[in-house]
């Protein structure tokens, strides 16, 4: 069966969610890349449900985003949603609750492969976040992840992605996963986990390696981009010129 390449970042995000699911709880986190990729405890979580909700919204732009999220979220309400999000799902008139948790960044993979420009990425990511995560850090995290995926999907080399994210989102990406393993405490905020997830992606050699690095660093999720394997990276010295056509 041929898979539409637009869906590959979504598949990668779901894969990362399933693999990382058994390491989310305190006491289950590890500091090594040597672990079984799947076992009997591996499962999809709320992040998969919301990733699919955003993808559905992008495919059906005439439908209301909140209605789509409520429909899928209520159908799968017991797959790991946090307390505040469950309250949002159960409310007859759901309102954003000023969250800066990384849930806003976990659900945006489809935006990165659907948008045509960085401006569109920023707009769609904000729109997807503010239904719940209307704190500036919650919006920023969603936009940063969606932008990183967009740039990767459009064949930008990692050095350009790192440069763009640092300059436009003020994230410190000048660390290694080894540093993070030694010093990082689990943090579910956007500002405390999105940079670490992007670092795992930047250090990785492929999708599996990215997931293993993210898990070993105890980052709450793995930023996965999964695009056609025959990607042709641009020369390293044309980052700024290349961005101009993508704005």
PLM feature segments, named:
Residues 1-247:
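Structured, active/binding-site neighborhoods that engage oxygen-rich ligands
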